[in-house]
């Protein structure tokens, strides 16, 4: 095996770092929160297992596509599949896919962190969280996790993580629906109006309403995700 692989201590260290890093933003408390973290953790472990441990995807594709894409080799540089497929010859860490991944991953972590601040503030006051990211969509933290995973797929796609991503998206969707049923019983009047105005997953600019003096103000009220 190439010296770039079989580095199991790096698999463990990097996996732990990213899992703890996400947890510091997400602050899991309930069983549902831990399921969300568990889904993300499984993705991260699968990612770094191929990045530094055993490059299963490279082995499978090199025999099939090796003659057409000579850069597709069992090396760390060869693991940047998008670069191999588009023929990028420069530093793989400076490719368009790699740079885009930084923005998507960073945006995902930012969304998780900012959403938690608004969620925590609302919980402290016994209110429904509908300010900040929650004014744009009902489940910003789940979307944040999906953005982080999508960013890693831009940077280092593998067969296992590509297969896992849609499955994890369904897992988060089911968690969101379960959560909404619970929230609806706690914040019945507010939730019905909030759910009517704010989309579940796709961000939408908050509606604006006219006040008594005809000035325009954001229409928001201030539950995890």
Predicted regions and their residues:
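Membrane-anchoring alpha-helices and their flanking helix-loop junctions
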Residues: 1-130, 148-225
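Short alpha-helical H-box segment flanking the phosphoacceptor histidine in two-component systems
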Residues: 133
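Histidine-centered phosphotransfer motif of kinases
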Residues: 136-143
